[in-house]
Amino acid sequence: MKNFLESLIENNRQYVEHGKLASYIPELEKANKEDLGIYIVTLDGKEVGAGEYDKKFTIQSISKVITLMLAILDNGKDRVFSRVGVEPTGDSFNSIVSLERKPSKKPFNPMVNSGAILTTSLIEGDSEEEKFERILEFTRKVTGNDDIQLNEDVYLSEKETGDRNRALAYFMKSNGVIEGNIDDILDLYFKQCSLEVNAKDLARFGAMLANDGVLPWNGERVISREICRIIKTIMVTCGMYDDSGKFAVHIGIPAKSGVGGGIMAAVPRRMGIGIFGPSLDDKGNSIAGTHVMKDLSEELDLSIF
């Protein structure tokens, strides 16, 4: 398997040249565009990686899956989905247009920025610090890594350049869609996106989802089978931004990407996959990472469809 993964990485490394580093968060531009790595955790206990799988990067939008799970655990699925929809959108992940044209004014789904900000606002805690600590601890639990920390530089960079997210949040506030102190909610959102992970962490997270909400390494149930099914369904329809339909057709695996270059994927009852490749396509997904996923899916027949 290791030789197979190494060949996948080398065969697809050429695609990094066709992408760009995320530029709207200055700190993310410091990444090495050439990096590409993959890690796989199978449900029968095998772990194998190739390329830059142990290199740290920020989780970015993959954190939206974590906060969605936490919000559902805190509030129940009915309350969460009364506030945010589950419909895919053809607009970009930070679009304001989609909020304006929707009669209910609630965000389309929890994987676009507006929906994720609203989801974060539903997480319980007596203070912003307590809420962040809960997100951090939950992230450590689902990745099996107690050493995950906040990248302070990326957090400050996000905070400094997050005007589009502020616009989304205040637009929702003006329509009565979101409650609470907007500055505190956004600060929490910027922090959750700035947690440092590697491809191995993402693969272990994916393995938990592939295992119907149970951590494969210790048998602990983190979320119910039903919540896990909902999460994976939303990942299929909305997880790869406005490229989700194409990804479902050609690759067919529940996955979530982030502009830090990560892809977290879950092949039900088989494996979790973590990818790192910070060179992005025009949708904000890892360009070489997506090619790796396509080859992996075809070679191992991983599509759920």
UniProtKB/Swiss-Prot annotation:
InterPro entries: Beta-lactam/transpept-like (IPR012338), Glutaminase (IPR015868). Transmembrane segments: none annotated. Its EC number is 3.5.1.2. Signal peptide: none annotated. It comes from the Bacteria. One of its GO terms (biological process) is glutamine catabolic process. It catalyses: L-glutamine + H2O = L-glutamate + NH4(+). Belongs to the glutaminase family. Keywords: Hydrolase. GO terms for molecular function: glutaminase activity. It holds the Pfam family Glutaminase. The gene is glsA2. Homotetramer. Coiled coil: none annotated. Substrate binds at S61, N113, E158, N165, Y189, Y241, V259. The keyword Hydrolase applies. This is Glutaminase 2.
